[in-house]
Amino acid sequence: MFKIKAADGTNNLCGKRIAEIRKEKRLSQRKLAIKMQLLGFDVDHYFIRRVENGERFVTDIDLVIFSRALNIPISELLPEDMAL
């Protein structure tokens, strides 16, 4: 199956932004995973790591949960240039 990757070869466009925002909010990957679990999303800190490192594809549902857990609009999770 063919899968589209970002220009930098990663599997998502939002991983770096998620890591930046998480660090700005002084959250560990484990604490972010717990916040997402409290929203009913079954994840652990390995999921967060894989997203941030660009190893995992991210769905629209993932974006919604990240935005709710980080208390930010979804648009802030995406890079400004959106280059593929």
List where the protein language model places each region.
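Residue-level signal for the short linker/turn that defines the boundary of a DNA-recognition helix
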Residues: 13-16, 26-27, 43, 58-61
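Alpha-helical residues within the helix-turn-helix
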Residues: 23, 34, 68
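DNA major-groove recognition helix of helix-turn-helix/homeodomain DNA-binding modules
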Residues: 55, 59-76
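Residue-level detection of the helix-turn-helix DNA-binding "recognition helix"
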Residues: 23, 37-38, 53, 82
